[in-house]
Amino acid sequence: MAKFRLETSAERNGRNSVEGVERTVFFISDGTAITAEVLGHAVLSQFPIKITSYTLPFVASETRAEEIKQQINQIYQDTRIRPLVFYSIISSGVKNIITSSEGFCQDIVQTLVAPLQQETGLEPKPELNRTHGLTEKNLSQYDARIAAIDYALAHDDGISLRNLDQAQVILLGVSRCGKTPTSLYLAMQFGIQAANYPFTADDMDNLQLPATLKQFQHKLFGLTISPERLAAIREERRENSRYASLRQCRIEISEVEALFRKNKINYLNTTNYSVEEISTKIIDMMKLNRRMF
């Protein structure tokens, strides 16, 4: 019978040192798998790795764990490269099955829990779905987050200017500069009630801050973007239109930035930032209270 030889760590490291190496990654959890995904991606971002990922939540039975083990093993047999497995699992039976696979398995939570246990002298008491599940302890926080999402939707793109006193921040900017995704991310991730108001092409002839917004000056925050990037985004929406022309984008950005400066409104150029980075910078610059869920 033919035998195959496991490569040494030195051989594997030499092969993996090539820029852009591809690896298969599993994020496995007996809960939502959000924690495994977030922490796993944070670690993987440190390496020049192209990944094909599988996110497998609610792996609570040994039968399901065996199926996943077979999937991991099959990939290894086909490629002779161990899949990377980031897991967060409470059940020892399920955990043992996953870790007996041919994957390179990392307990994403226990790696941090063990030294913290040693430092505090406390015994951890893991509970299923504690981090992202709905419990009596976090019910009020959950309700606040849902209320923030409802608020963001009701006050998106200037739909309503009522109840702006309830907003923690009011985002201003031209169309397609990132106001809506940022408002929703602030609501979903941090429970922050964010409204947003657009400046349109029709406003440019005599651009002024609406009187309704002036009374909430301390809540206003501007978003801007490079005209080139804005034109590219708008072109996908309305191809070959005046709305998407570089000239129109330059006019709008110039006018809006002048308005921000005139009214002493803090603003951020979003061109090279993700929605996560934009939201975090707004929280920092506006000194908003962030709540994690």
UniProtKB/Swiss-Prot annotation:
- The positions annotated for binding ADP are 173-180
- By its UniProt entry, which PANTHER family does this protein fall under? PYRUVATE, PHOSPHATE DIKINASE REGULATORY PROTEIN 1, CHLOROPLASTIC
Question: Which range is the signal sequence, renumbered to this chain?
Answer: none
The UniProt catalytic activity note for this protein reads: [pyruvate, water dikinase] + ADP = [pyruvate, water dikinase]-phosphate + AMP + H(+); [pyruvate, water dikinase]-phosphate + phosphate + H(+) = [pyruvate, water dikinase] + diphosphate
Q: Which domain of life is it from?
A: Bacteria
Give the Pfam families listed for this entry: Kinase-PPPase (PF03618)
Q: Where do the coiled-coil regions begin and end?
A: none
Q: Which UniProt keywords apply?
A: Kinase, Nucleotide-binding, Serine/threonine-protein kinase, Transferase
| Cited InterPro entries | Kinase-pyrophosphorylase, PSRP, TF_DNA-bd_sf
Which GO molecular function annotations are given, in alphabetical order? ADP binding; ATP binding; DNA binding; phosphotransferase activity, phosphate group as acceptor; protein serine/threonine kinase activity
Q: Does the keyword Cell membrane apply?
A: no
NCBIfam families xrefs: PRK05339.1 (NF003742)
Q: What does this protein do?
A: Bifunctional serine/threonine kinase and phosphorylase involved in the regulation of the phosphoenolpyruvate synthase (PEPS) by catalyzing its phosphorylation/dephosphorylation.
EC id: 2.7.11.33, 2.7.4.28
**Membership in a protein family:** Belongs to the pyruvate, phosphate/water dikinase regulatory protein family. PSRP subfamily.
- Please give the name of this protein: Putative phosphoenolpyruvate synthase regulatory protein
One GO process term, biological-process aspect: regulation of DNA-templated transcription
User: Keyword Lipid metabolism on this protein?
Assistant: no
